[in-house]
């Protein structure tokens, strides 16, 4: 029973309008698994469905179809109490630490309240555990921060605090949505490092949603998987370092090609691959073909008509592309 | 810990109000009136014996605000009347805020048909003009000897709706806030989310509204006395004003200027104090509220 | 469009509930419009009061034994046909009274709103742009003090100062009876002169509140990035003040403008009674005093309709002028 | 967005202007073209105008039977047979030239030169029709059994046997009897009116004779009278005819919510003497409004109650303003609810009579009023000497302000003062509420003073305002402890009978539930005031007998205190002399005593006799 | 290359409820004509303050305490408001950071162009305006017909950013200042904008100054890099030198913490600690609490702004008295 979360054929459709006629397919037939101690990165640009996927995994949103299993149980079929029990094991960290921390609560309260609730502790034990937790995620000395408010912290500090709060329930997996996008460059690595440490030292599975390929690489270069989303579909999936070094899907390639390089000489000499279109595709239930077809430089007629299946091109590397699929 | 949080509370909520000029002046004015209502009647005696020959005395040491049409000291009446003015006003504001908050929070949290129903109720109270409705209610309840609390409730019934609407909008936006979602993820109970997460951010907002309600409640309570709904209290400022304007015609005589002036001055000053305080509170707390939206 | 259909249906439900509430309220009001007449009859003709009351009821066309439900059905039925009921005191249909009174009230509140809105907007924007300076302190303090004055006190003071002390304004009425209503300059002048008192009584507190809201909104808009960007582009202060600050700060107020007019319909009772101005509020006050339940429910319904229409119009106007709402 | 906003504002401006224009046109009730184009009789052009204040129904229908009648225009529009000056007891003939009173029969000879304002002559047919109309519409006065018109200028009233002797006075002076329903205006209703009136009378006489009334007669009457009433109520001569033909001195020509314009009746019999041909009425919306109008010369005369300082101020601001007072033939009293056990104790009422400083109350309330210093005998102060003998006065208890006396009465009756508060013999505090009608300024002031004095004596009295429109209801339902009300009052007919009737068999007894039928101990034996009132009514013509009964009633009233009169109400009349009009009679002129119950009669009389003239 | 803007000892503060934020504390900087200068720093390090103070466009609570900004020999800070207004945009255009809120939400894009033109007394007919605006919009690869008649909220974040750049180019300015032109944008859009700026630089004779927290962006675009820390300028050098041989320990930490896609991930090293609060900045060198080379003197004395060989400037005690960094 090492599988923590399984996503089976999950799709998500957003509808709007009086008769719900206008709709938009945000996720399409997603299958994913997270097991104990895994590292997983979901990459893609905004509007590609990565946040929705993360929220569905964390049961913050319901899929339109498909199953979400936590520890082998379908979370939409089990009763409330069981779901509550399991929920503690799956935690979620928001993108924006400014918004996800209560602005009028002290740091002590932010950690101690959920801790007391989850661990049924109080008094001195609670105090000690809160202190330990804050120190664990690097807010030292903990007592110094107890009576401070979130706005006294830097972006990095706030994100640490949000992570610490997620740890109060002793989760087995933490899903973090763009945890570094609102944080300064110089502090980003430290946050990713923190996630790596949590994974290494405590065996907590970590799912990160990122658009920064560099950070994805940093997180997965030792171990872990990367999933690339485009237009609500998984276009490529596999071991992190493998994908980053040998991207198969044209989109992944462009993504890596476009990422900033911290070397002036290389940067100046590189040639950026241009896409045919930079629009975010809007898919409906009627849409056909590969979602990337409209932008892809390698598209064929087939791409417009047929949805490419996710095929394994190598051990631990799957891609969904008619051109590069073989 | 406790001492620390008290200190924090002071620095977060009290000290900024004392630093802000408007709220400071507002606080001073309100404190003055509250003192007048609580301690005042103990210090200042009230002699209502009329003395027609001594009417319309100009302000003097003996009569700081002069005497009224009956020859009774105006200052004494103002001091003693402040008790009923302030108790009714404060109670009505309190009830209005209470009802408004409870219904607003409920509306903000409840979705679907129940939410729409509450919405409709709020809307109903918004579209029925409050003053005429109160006139009718006054007549309906005329023969019940209502006490202050009941009258305050009656007034509050016509004051809470706008607040409820605003609060529900606030809660609607607050409940989709990420920190609320985080609390849900952490299995925090509903009461924690409502009373700790959401209520905490509503407090400054509610407070501002409480102060704003004072004005409405004040006007209503004066109106009610005019209408004979509230128990007749000759020193209630509204009644004093009624006597001055309509019974004694003080406006129409040069001698009576101070009579009207001091009553209006006190009414206006009290409301102005409330307005200042609420403006100050808004200045102090709203940026933070806005910043978190 | 769907949004509006939806909204309309919702307001209709609100309307029915509100009107029913009003009906119940009014019908629980103690007092019998025929009572005064009955006392008079009994005394004049030396007859039993009960008998006199019966006669009085007949004279006024009131059936005291009619059940509330029947009355309610009748009332709703009439309302559906646009008939607001019958006034026992004035012995005429409420529609006729509304036709007489509503134009005056609308005239006063629209003119008052127009004046107070234009001046309030200007003063508020001006004060906000001079934030912290003496003139700002002066304007906002004055506005706050005016807000603190209960409206009926203000009305009485205006009446006294302008009409009694300095005799600048005529006392009561909408125009002098010895003039023929026409579109002549002199007649319109008289109408305006008669309306000055009520208009001032409505406009002054309004102005204060517009000023304060506009000041707050302007201050908020001035912090917006697009204002600084406009400055960075070297735009003239006047252009920024009008096109960028004022327009954006005004938007929320324009919506409340429409709603405000709706609410004012119901708030005219005191002012119109004090100025003896023949508008809706005047009749409303009279209807309460003489327990004219027909007139009371009719006028109440009118006011509720006014507020609801205003709410609807406000939504519509807001969507019309704010692209942010329009495009959603 | 800018352009949209501009459009919005433009629409806004257009809307309010159209609203204004709509408001302007089609506002007033005014006669149609037809009326104004009518050829006018040749007349010398007069330019006199007087401005007054009063109330009237609006929209103006001009139907005296409709709700609100024609308001304050009444006495200008409907002339009675005669005016009665109470101070001199003189009848001034108006529509009647002369009259003859016989047993159950009054013959009135009508003025031959009376004409309606549309030129139609006024005849006895109009009077007959009017009487039928009132009887049909108001089910009153059934004192008139029948009315005949032997010729165009003679009317014979046959009175019923039960008719009271004061009815003749009513018949002659009541503005309703003569000209309410001119035949040429109400021509469609004439027969129906007679039918309904006759049927009503028939039923009434059967009832008074104690005979059974056939059910079908009753239903028939119900049906017919309802139908008739509905038809008449819906008839609005001012609207449908475009004019209101009147026999009185002035005809309303234009009416708005706030003003009413009346033009002189060119055909009026006194027309040649009238120097004023226009009356403008301003709406009497509140006393303050009338004060303001008087200061600014907006009106020429009015009779609002006004505090002393305001009068002084008014006189300095407007030196042309004069004031005089006449008795309003009524008094303001403290009335008790005898259903409450507290007030059943005469001792308490006596004590209250001693506690109150009635001069002070008068000062605060209506300073010009006559004060009752000592007695509470139910007779107006101004008339006391005329009706009460010295001998009787000797017998009456003097209720001078004397708290010691009050204390003694209470102590003797078993009341105790504990601390600051008086307790009843049963240990309950003496506590009650004093109700007073909110819109009556002077009453409220009086009530405040009463409450104040009683409280300083050691009672627990609270004041309660009765909201506008609720006075009759509250008082009738007995939902009060004590109240300020009219006490005994003369109203139209200045005779103590009216007052005692009110106290023991009328309005006041209806609201106080004073046990008037009980027997009370008097020097003349055990007497019941109720019986005395009936007896007085029967013996009105017999002056000696009447005087004797009045003495007895005065004694009972003074000793048993059904009410405590506070002051005799006066009518302060303010008039501007020399601004628009002049020629007001001196303050002593008895004509002023016509004012109570219809001050417009005074104005009408002054104008039609040519006394009031415009200022050059 | 000549100096086009010279900043001398610029000091600017913000007044807030809690006190004074010393956001720019003695900045001296020379900007070369037709060069691209990057100002790099963390959020709240004062980097935006520098460019806003330079153009006198600080927010209402900002105050310039001292310093000179010489543009073509004239001091912008003491210049009359009227004169300055003429220079703004026509010669020096500043594109603010908050591209998302920088357009009036109630005005169409075209009206912004119109306003700008009118403000500078340029008399173009309407068709001329459309033509010029379209030209600039095409330059930033936007479809003029669609964009000009749109309201800001109809545009995506990247589009708004490009509209602002087009607007900035409208009057062909000499100096273009961009505040965080790429932050909060997706990878592809970010690459796109960088590409665009590179092309603009080639196409137009323009001096480009931009502010960023991402030193990798500077690597791609800038000729020279100025590094700001805690309101102080700590290093100023050519881009190549900065990356090859970072002098200041902070610069070095910054480069080490970059998770660029081409970097050796095992060498990525986060900077410990948090950025300083500018309300109560640390004494002496503001970096000393986080500096691994900190000495006693660093706590007490503020390092001087010294010029080393070549173009290198640095403010660090390690280099004073010729102490070379080991």
Curated annotation (Swiss-Prot), chain E:
Location relative to the cell: Cell membrane
Alphabetized UniProt keyword annotations: 4Fe-4S, ATP-binding, Cell membrane, Iron, Iron-sulfur, Membrane, Metal-binding, Nucleotide-binding, Peptide transport, Protein transport, Translocase, Transport
Reactions that this protein is recorded to catalyse: a dipeptide(out) + ATP + H2O = a dipeptide(in) + ADP + phosphate + H(+)
Positions bound to [4Fe-4S] cluster: 285, 291, 298, 316
Regulation: The C-terminal iron-sulfur cluster may stabilize the structure of the C-terminal loops and may function in the regulation of the transport process.
A single cellular component GO annotation: plasma membrane
InterPro entries: AAA+_ATPase, ABC_transporter-like_ATP-bd, ABC_transporter-like_CS, Oligopep_ABC_C, P-loop_NTPase
Any GO BP annotation: peptide transport
Class of this enzyme: translocase
Keyword Iron-sulfur: yes
EC identifiers of the protein: 7.4.2.9
Binding site for ATP: 44-49, 61, 97
GO MF annotation terms: 4 iron, 4 sulfur cluster binding; ATP binding; ATP hydrolysis activity; metal ion binding
The keyword DNA repair belongs to this UniProt entry's keyword annotation: no
Main location: membrane
Function summary: Part of the ABC transporter Dpp involved in dipeptide transport. Responsible for energy coupling to the transport system.
Sequence similarity: Belongs to the ABC transporter superfamily.
PANTHER family referenced in this protein's UniProt entry, alphabetically: MALTOSE ABC TRANSPORTER, ATP-BINDING PROTEIN, OLIGOPEPTIDE/DIPEPTIDE ABC TRANSPORTER, ATPASE SUBUNIT
Domain notes: Contains an N-terminal conserved nucleotide-binding domain and a C-terminal domain bound with a [4Fe-4S] cluster. The C-terminal domain forms a stable loop region and interacts with the N-terminal domain.
Protein name in the entry: Dipeptide transport ATP-binding protein DppD
Gene name of the record: dppD
């Amino acid at each position: 029973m090492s599988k923590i979360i399984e996503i089976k054929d999950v799709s998500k459709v957003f509808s709007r309008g009086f008769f719900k006629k206008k709709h938009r397919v945000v996720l399409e037939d997603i299958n994913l698994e997270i097991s104990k101690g895994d590292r997983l990165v979901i990459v893609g640009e905004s509007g590609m469905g990565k946040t929705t996927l993360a929220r569905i995994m964390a049961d913050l949103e319901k899929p339109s179809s498909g199953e979400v299993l936590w520890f082998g149980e379908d979370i939409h079929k089990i009763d409330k109490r069981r779901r509550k029990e399991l929920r503690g094991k799956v935690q979620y960290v928001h993108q924006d630490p400014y918004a996800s921390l209560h602005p009028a609560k002290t740091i002590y309260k932010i950690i101690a309240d959920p801790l007391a609730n989850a661990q049924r502790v109080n008094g001195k034990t609670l105090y000690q555990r809160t202190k330990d937790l804050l120190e664990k995620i690097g807010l030292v000395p903990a007592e110094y921060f107890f009576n401070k408010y979130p706005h006294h912290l830097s972006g990095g500090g706030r994100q640490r605090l949000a992570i610490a709060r997620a740890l109060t329930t002793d989760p087995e997996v933490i899903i973090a949505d763009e945890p570094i996008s609102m944080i300064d460059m110089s502090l980003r690595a430290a946050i990713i490092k923190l996630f790596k440490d949590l994974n290494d030292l405590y065996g907590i599975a970590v799912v990160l949603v990122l658009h920064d390929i560099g950070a994805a690489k940093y997180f997965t270069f030792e171990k872990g998987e990367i999933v690339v989303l485009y237009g609500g579909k998984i276009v490529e999936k596999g071991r992190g370092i493998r994908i980053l070094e040998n991207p198969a899907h044209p989109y992944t390639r462009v993504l890596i090609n476009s990422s900033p390089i911290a070397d002036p000489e290389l940067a100046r000499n590189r040639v950026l691959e241009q896409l045919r279109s930079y629009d975010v595709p809007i898919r409906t239930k009627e849409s056909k073909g590969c979602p990337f077809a409209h932008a892809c430089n390698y598209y064929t007629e087939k791409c417009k008509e047929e949805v490419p299946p996710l095929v394994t091109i190598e051990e631990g590397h799957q891609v969904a592309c008619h051109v590069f699929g073989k | 810990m406790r001492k620390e949080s008290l200190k924090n509370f002071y620095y977060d909520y009290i000290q900024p109000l004392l630093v802000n000029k408007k709220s400071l002046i507002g606080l001073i004015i309100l404190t003055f009136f509250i003192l007048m209502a609580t301690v005042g009647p103990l210090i200042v005696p009230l002699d209502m014996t009329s003395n027609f020959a001594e009417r319309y005395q100009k302000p003097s040491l003996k009569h700081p605000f002069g005497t009224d049409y009956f020859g009774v000291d105006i200052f004494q009446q103002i001091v003693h009347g402040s008790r009923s003015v302030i108790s009714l006003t404060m109670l009505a504001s309190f009830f209005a805020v209470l009802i408004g908050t409870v219904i607003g929070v409920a509306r903000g949290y409840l979705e679907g048909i129940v939410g729409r129903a509450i919405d409709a109720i709020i809307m109903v109270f918004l579209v029925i003009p409050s003053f005429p409705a109160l006139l009718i209610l006054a007549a309906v309840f005329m023969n019940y000897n209502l006490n202050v609390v009941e009258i305050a409730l009656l007034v509050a019934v016509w004051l809470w709706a706008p607040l409820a609407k605003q609060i529900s909008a606030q809660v609607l936006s607050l409940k989709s806030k990420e920190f609320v979602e985080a609390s849900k993820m952490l299995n925090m109970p509903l009461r924690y989310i409502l009373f700790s997460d959401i209520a905490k951010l509503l407090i400054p907002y509610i407070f501002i509204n409480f102060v704003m309600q004072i004005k409405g409640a004040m006007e209503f309570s004066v109106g009610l006395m005019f209408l004979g709904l509230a128990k007749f209290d000759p020193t209630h400022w509204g009644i004093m004003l009624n006597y001055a304007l309509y019974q004694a015609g003080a406006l129409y005589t040069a001698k009576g200027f101070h009579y009207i002036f001091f009553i209006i001055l006190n009414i206006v000053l009290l409301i102005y104090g409330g307005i200042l305080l609420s403006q100050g509170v808004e200045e102090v707390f709203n940026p933070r509220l806005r910043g978190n939206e | 469009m769907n949004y509006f259909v939806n909204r309309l249906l919702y307001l209709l439900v609100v309307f029915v509930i509100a009107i029913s509430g009003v009906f119940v309220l009014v019908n629980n009001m103690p007092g019998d419009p025929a009572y005064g007449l009955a006392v008079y009859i009994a005394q004049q003709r030396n007859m039993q009061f009960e008998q006199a009351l019966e006669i009085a009821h007949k004279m006024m066309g009131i059936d005291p034994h009619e059940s509330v439900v029947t009355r309610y059905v009748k009332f709703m039925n009439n309302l559906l046909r646009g008939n607001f009921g019958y006034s026992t005191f004035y012995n005429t249909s409420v529609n006729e009274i509304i036709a007489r009174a509503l134009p005056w009230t609308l005239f006063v509140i629209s003119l008052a709103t127009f004046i107070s809105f234009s001046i309030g907007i200007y003063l508020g924007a001006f004060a906000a742009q001079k934030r912290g300076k003496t003139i700002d302190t002066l304007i906002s303090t004055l506005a706050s003090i005016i807000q603190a004055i209960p409206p009926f006190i203000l009305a009485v003071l205006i009446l006294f100062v302008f009409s009694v002390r300095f005799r600048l304004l005529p006392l009561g009425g909408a125009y002098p009876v010895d003039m023929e209503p026409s579109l002549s300059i002199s007649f319109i002048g008289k109408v305006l002169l008669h309306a000055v008192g009520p208009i001032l009584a409505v406009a002054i507190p309004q102005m204060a509140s517009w000023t304060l809201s506009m000041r707050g909104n302007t201050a908020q808009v001035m912090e917006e990035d697009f204002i600084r960007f406009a400055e960075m582009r070297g735009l003239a202060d006047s252009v920024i003040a009008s096109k960028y600050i004022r327009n954006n700060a005004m938007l929320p107020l324009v919506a409340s403008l429409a709603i405000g007019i709706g609410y004012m319909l119901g708030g005219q009772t005191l002012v119109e009674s004090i100025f003896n101005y023949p508008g809706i509020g005047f009749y409303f006050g009279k209807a309460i005093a003489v327990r004219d339940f027909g007139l009371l429910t009719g006028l109440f319904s009118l006011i509720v309709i006014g507020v609801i229409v205003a709410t609807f119009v406000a939504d519509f106007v807001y969507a019309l002028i704010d692209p942010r709402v329009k495009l959603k | 967005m800018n352009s949209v906003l501009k459009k919005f504002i433009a629409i806004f401006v257009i809307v309010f202007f159209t609203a204004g224009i709509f408001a302007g046109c089609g506002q007033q009730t005014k006669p149609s073209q037809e009326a104004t184009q009518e050829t006018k009789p040749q007349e010398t052009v007069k330019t006199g105008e007087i401005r007054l204040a009063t109330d009237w129904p609006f929209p103006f229908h001009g139907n005296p039977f409709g709700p609100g009648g024609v308001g304050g225009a009444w006495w200008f529009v409907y002339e009675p047979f005669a005016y009665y000056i109470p101070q001199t007891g003189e009848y001034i003939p108006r529509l009647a030239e002369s009259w003859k009173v016989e047993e159950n029969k009054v013959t009135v000879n009508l003025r031959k030169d009376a004409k309606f304002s549309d030129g139609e002559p006024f005849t006895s047919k109009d009077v007959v029709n009017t009487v039928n109309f009132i009887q049909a519409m108001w089910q009153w006065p059934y004192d008139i059994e029948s009315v005949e018109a032997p010729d165009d200028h003679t009317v014979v009233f046959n009175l019923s046997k039960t008719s009271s002797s004061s009815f003749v006075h009513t018949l002659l002076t009541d503005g309703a009897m003569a000209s309410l329903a001119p035949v040429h205006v109400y021509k469609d209703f004439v027969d129906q009116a007679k039918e309904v009136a006759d049927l009503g009378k028939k039923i009434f006489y059967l009832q008074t004779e104690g005979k059974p009334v056939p059910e079908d007669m009753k239903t028939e009457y119900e049906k017919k009278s309802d139908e008739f009433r509905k038809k008449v109520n819906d008839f609005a001569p001012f609207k449908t005819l475009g004019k209101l033909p009147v026999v009185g001195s002035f005809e309303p020509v234009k009416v708005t919510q706030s003003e009413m314009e009346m033009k002189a009746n060119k055909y009026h019999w006194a027309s040649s003497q009238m120097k004023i041909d226009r009356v403008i009425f301003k709406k009497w919306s509140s006393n303050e409004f009338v004060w303001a109008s008087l200061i600014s010369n907006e009106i020429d005369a009015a009779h609002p109650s006004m505090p002393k300082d305001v009068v002084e101020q008014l006189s300095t601001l407007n030196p042309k303003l004069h004031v005089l007072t006449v008795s309003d033939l009524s008094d303001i009293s403290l009335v008790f609810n005898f259903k409450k056990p507290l007030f059943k104790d005469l001792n308490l009422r006596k004590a209250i009579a001693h506690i109150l400083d009635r001069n002070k109350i008068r000062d605060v309330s209506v300073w010009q009023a006559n004060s009752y210093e000592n007695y509470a005998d139910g007779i107006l102060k101004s008339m006391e000497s005329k009706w009460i003998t010295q001998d009787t006065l000797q017998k009456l208890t003097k209720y001078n302000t004397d708290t010691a006396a009050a204390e003694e009465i209470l102590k003797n009756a078993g009341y105790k003062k504990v601390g600051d508060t008086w307790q009843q013999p049963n240990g309950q505090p003496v506590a009650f509420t004093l109700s007073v009608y909110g819109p009556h300024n002077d009453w409220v002031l009086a009530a405040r003073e009463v409450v104040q004095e009683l409280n300083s004596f050691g009672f627990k009295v609270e004041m309660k305002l009765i909201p506008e429109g609720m006075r009759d209801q509250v008082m009738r339902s007995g939902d009060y402890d004590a109240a300020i009300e009219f006490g005994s009052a003369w109203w139209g007919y200045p005779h103590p009978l009216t007052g005692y009737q009110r106290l023991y068999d009328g309005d006041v007894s209806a609201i106080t539930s004073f046990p008037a039928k009980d027997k009370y101990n008097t020097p003349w034996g055990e007497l019941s005031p109720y019986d005395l009132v009936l007896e007085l009514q029967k013996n009105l013509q017999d002056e000696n007998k009447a005087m004797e009964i009045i003495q007895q009633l005065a004694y009972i009233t003074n000793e048993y205190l059904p009410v405590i009169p506070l002051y005799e109400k006066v009518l302060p009349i303010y008039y501007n002399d020399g601004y628009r009009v002049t020629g007001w009679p001196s303050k002593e002129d008895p004509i002023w005593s016509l004012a109570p119950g219809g001050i417009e009669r005074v104005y009408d009389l002054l104008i039609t006799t040519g006394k009031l003239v415009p200022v050059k | 290359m000549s100096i086009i803007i010279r900043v001398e000892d610029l000091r600017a503060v913000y007044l807030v409820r809690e006190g004074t934020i010393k956001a720019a504390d003695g900045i001296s900087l020379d900007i070369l004509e037709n060069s691209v200068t990057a100002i790099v720093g963390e959020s709240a390090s004062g980097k935006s303050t520098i460019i806003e103070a330079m153009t006198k466009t600080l927010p209402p609570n900002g105050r310039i305490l001292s310093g000179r900004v010489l543009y073509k020999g004239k001091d912008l800070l003491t210049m009359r408001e009227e004169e300055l207004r003429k220079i703004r945009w026509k010669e020096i255009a500043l594109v603010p950071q908050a591209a998302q809120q920088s357009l009036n939400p109630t005005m169409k894009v075209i009206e912004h162009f119109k306003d700008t033109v009118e403000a500078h007394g340029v008399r173009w007919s309407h068709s001329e305006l459309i033509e010029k605006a379209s030209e600039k919009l095409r330059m930033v690869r936007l479809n003029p017909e669609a964009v000009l008649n749109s309201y800001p909220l109809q545009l995506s974040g990247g589009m708004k950013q490009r509209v602002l750049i087009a607007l900035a180019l409208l009057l062909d300015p000499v100096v273009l200042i961009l505040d965080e032109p790429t932050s909060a944008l997706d990878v592809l859009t970010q690459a796109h904008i960088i590409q665009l700026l590179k092309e603009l630089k080639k196409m137009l004779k323009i001096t480009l100054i931009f502010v960023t927290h991402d030193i990798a962006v500077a690597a791609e675009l800038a000729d020279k890099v100025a590094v700001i820390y805690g309101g102080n300028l700590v290093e100023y050098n050519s881009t190549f030198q900065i990356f090859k041989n970072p002098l200041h320990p902070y610069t070095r930490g910054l480069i080490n913490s970059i998770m660029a896609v081409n970097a050796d991930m095992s060498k990525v090293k986060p900077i410990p600690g948090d950025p300083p609060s500018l309300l109560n900045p640390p004494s002496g060198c503001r970096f000393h609490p986080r500096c691994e080379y900190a000495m006693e003197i660093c706590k007490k004395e503020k390092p001087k702004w010294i010029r080393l060989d070549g173009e290198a400037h640095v403010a660090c005690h390690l280099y004073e008295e010729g102490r070379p960094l080991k």
